[in-house]
From Swiss-Prot:
Compositionally biased residues, Polar residues: 1-12, 22-33
CDD domains documented for this protein: MetAP2
One term under GO cellular component: cytoplasm
Protein name according to UniProt: Methionine aminopeptidase 2
InterPro entries according to UniProt: Creatinase/aminopeptidase-like (IPR036005), Met_Aminopeptidase_Type2 (IPR050247), Pept_M24 (IPR000994), Pept_M24_MAP (IPR001714), Pept_M24A_MAP2 (IPR002468), Pept_M24A_MAP2_BS (IPR018349), WH-like_DNA-bd_sf (IPR036388), WH_DNA-bd_sf (IPR036390)
Species annotation: Candida tropicalis (strain ATCC MYA-3404 / T1)
Cofactor remark: Binds 2 divalent metal cations per subunit. Has a high-affinity and a low affinity metal-binding site. The true nature of the physiological cofactor is under debate. The enzyme is active with cobalt, zinc, manganese or divalent iron ions. Most likely, methionine aminopeptidases function as mononuclear Fe(2+)-metalloproteases under physiological conditions, and the catalytically relevant metal-binding site has been assigned to the histidine-containing high-affinity site.
Subcellular location, record wording: Cytoplasm
Encoding gene (name): MAP2
EC number assigned by the record: 3.4.11.18
Family: Belongs to the peptidase M24A family. Methionine aminopeptidase eukaryotic type 2 subfamily.
Residues noted as binding a divalent metal cation 1 in the record, renumbered to the chain: 203, 214, 413
Length: 432
């Protein structure tokens, strides 16, 4: 999902992370199995008149001039051997890890986890294709419901799983606008529409066998480049966090490096200079099987946390920048939920909430979900029972989190795998 929330409160390899379309190993088409760039390609088959070889006019057969939609097919059909594109490889930053690159023992250990890595790579390839479709299709005037359906239906079609727990959506699609930093997805009946001057964070989760790829980007439609600087600040801060991350690296050191880059930027609006701040109570996080926030948090400011990253862990490195207070609070109608872990001893307080809980377990397990997904799973008139589960600590709610009104926020995020010998930015693409 998006960042964990803490309510208590370069050249070099950074350049390597920037996309060179001639060198990227994770561009959307792979192994010559490219799909159309636009699954909604328009086919122009209107009637035309041509001359025959004798000069007589011949009328071409008139065909139906309708837009034809190309059906999205399972990602497996493009990779029948089950081997998916690798992400971007990077060496670990600390001197003590230099031996890992050439260690045969470390490479052997890495091969033992190959099924795990392939699950992540499959999810990442789905993610790249889905966001490619989103980036080419989303336009001002679309409703949030339309945008969410576009993204989520694409994930489901590419995953082509016979059960939500085998593969598919990793968490509700985040579509947070302007001062809303994270955890907004539309509930049924939401009338919110994307406007030309909005800045939208698009946070997409894809899982395969519970291995979650968590990656986010920011979209704008302002033709004057109003948001260019805040987007650049957050993108570069995320790249810095990825560069600094690695085995035995202290979490505080990553946050300190991110903050230095992020807060060196500012943007201008109507002649006024707006400093760009890290949203200090939002963090990256490690990812477990079927668990999006698995214990460790990766700060985006210096916070004194001396905890180290460890071999074999998976992290979502994400940063948020804001022109506001640089601090978020919950506000608005909740849409995001997840079952709490370690609460198996707690019992649902009513027969209806017991039925709802069983449906949640069957369809989502410990993966996050939203109200629209419950309705897709057949639930009706469930809000009272859902609120009971929340009050009893069985289900956790994640309402939208916002900075002050009138401010702007941006987000970029990638999932990284800490292999024994190198780190892999598995969700890297030719877009960001």
């Amino acid at each position: 999902m998006t960042a964990s929330v803490d309510t208590k409160t370069v050249e070099g390899q950074i350049n390597d992370l920037k996309i060179d379309s001639t060198e990227s190993s994770t561009t959307i088409p792979n192994n010559g199995k490219q799909e159309s760039d636009n699954e909604d390609d328009e086919v122009d088959e209107s009637s035309t008149t041509q001359l025959s070889s004798t000069g007589d006019k011949k009328k071409k057969k008139k065909k139906n001039n309708k837009k034809k939609k190309k059906k999205i097919v399972s990602i497996d059909s493009s990779y029948p051997d089950g081997v998916f594109p690798e992400g971007q490889w990077m060496e670990y930053p600390l001197e003590i890890n230099s031996y890992r690159t050439t260690s045969e023992e470390k490479r052997y250990l890495d091969r033992q986890e190959n099924n795990k890595w392939e699950d992540f790579r499959k999810g990442a390839e789905i993610h790249r294709r889905v966001r490619h479709k989103a980036q080419s299709s989303i336009k001002p005037g679309m409703s949030m419901i339309e945008i969410a359906d576009l993204i989520e239906d694409s994930v489901r079609n590419y995953a082509a799983a016979d059960h939500t727990l085998k593969a598919g959506i990793g968490f509700p699609t985040g579509l947070s606008l302007n001062h809303v930093a994270a955890h907004y997805t539309p509930n049924t009946g939401d009338k919110l529409v994307l406007n030309k001057d909005d800045i939208m964070k698009v946070d997409i989760g894809v899982h395969v066998n519970g291995r979650i790829c968590d990656s986010a980007f920011t979209m704008t439609f302002n033709e004057e480049g109003k948001y260019d600087k805040i987007m650049e600040a957050v993108r570069e801060a995320t790249y810095t966090g990825i560069k600094e991350a690695g085995i035995d690296v202290r979490l505080n050191d990553i946050g300190e490096a991110i903050q230095e880059v992020m807060e060196s930027y500012e943007m201008e609006e109507n002649g006024k200079i707006l400093p760009i701040k890290c949203i200090k109570n939002l963090n990256g996080h490690n990812i477990g099987d079927y668990v999006i926030h698995s214990g460790k948090t990766v700060p985006i400011v210096a916070n004194g946390d001396m905890t180290k990253m460890e071999e074999g862990e998976t992290f979502a490195i994400e940063t948020f920048g804001s022109t506001g207070n640089g601090y978020v609070l919950p506000e608005g109608e909740c849409s995001h939920y997840a079952m709490n872990t370690g609460v198996e001893h707690l019992k649902a307080p009513s027969e209806r909430s017991k039925q709802l809980l069983q449906n949640i377990k069957d369809n989502f397990g410990t993966l996050p979900w939203c109200r629209r997904y419950l309705e897709r799973a057949g639930e009706e008139k469930y809000l009272f029972a859902l609120n009971q589960l929340v009050r009893h600590g069985i289900v956790e709610e994640y309402p939208p989190i916002v900075d002050k009104r009138g401010s702007y926020t941006a987000q970029y995020e990638h999932t990284i795998l800490l292999h024994p010998h190198k780190k892999e930015v598995v969700t890297k693409g030719d877009d960001y």
